[in-house]
């Protein structure tokens, strides 16, 4: 699915990338792991007919962060969603700042404080600033003990979508 995967270059050097697939997503039963979405080969759950773009991975080289590369990747994803007339973007969002707070609060409390603006998380705050809403916390989403395997469930709704 090349139209849903993006690489940002500085000359011939890859400095950022965003990957995703079109999926069915059940917002009534949101608990899942990234592996559930990817399937065994990483794309087995993809179909051009599915209504949601699931952001499976996104990253920017540390030296290029704060330069608009992440925003550009989100805009490319949104452009893909509009082009294919999908309902929006859904993803599990990492919460790297939680590692500094996990001894004193749950992931749910941490995310609530980030959403309220009481705490800053480099990823979640950035996603909110880019029009995403946080729907909750996914437990066991990734194998990352530094954040107890937790991530956020985020959604961006395509206001240009037409059924």
Model regions and ranges:
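Short loop segments at secondary-structure junctions
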Residues: 11-12, 23, 63, 157-161
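Conserved acetyl-CoA-binding loop-helix of GNAT-fold acetyltransferases
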Residues: 60, 66-82, 90-91
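Short beta-strand micro-motifs in enzyme catalytic cores
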Residues: 4-6, 51, 148-154
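C-terminal/domain-terminus segments
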Residues: 72-80, 135-163
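Conserved beta-hairpin
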Residues: 4-18, 33
């Amino acid at each position: 699915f090349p139209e849903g995967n993006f690489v940002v270059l500085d000359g011939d050097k890859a400095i950022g990338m965003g990957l995703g697939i079109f999926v069915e997503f059940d917002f009534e039963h949101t608990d899942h792991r990234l592996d559930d979405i990817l399937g065994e080969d990483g794309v087995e759950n993809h179909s051009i007919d599915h209504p949601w773009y699931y952001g499976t991975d996104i990253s920017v080289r540390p030296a290029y962060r704060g330069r608009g590369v992440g925003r550009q990747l989100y805009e490319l994803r949104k452009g893909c969603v509009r082009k294919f007339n999908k309902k929006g973007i859904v993803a599990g969002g990492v919460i790297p700042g939680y590692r500094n707070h996990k001894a004193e609060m749950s992931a749910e409390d941490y995310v609530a404080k980030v959403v309220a603006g009481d705490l800053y998380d480099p990823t979640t705050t950035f996603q909110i600033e880019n029009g995403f809403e946080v729907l909750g916390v996914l437990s066991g989403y990734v194998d990352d003990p530094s954040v107890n395997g937790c991530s956020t469930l985020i959604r961006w709704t395509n206001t240009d979508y037409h059924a």
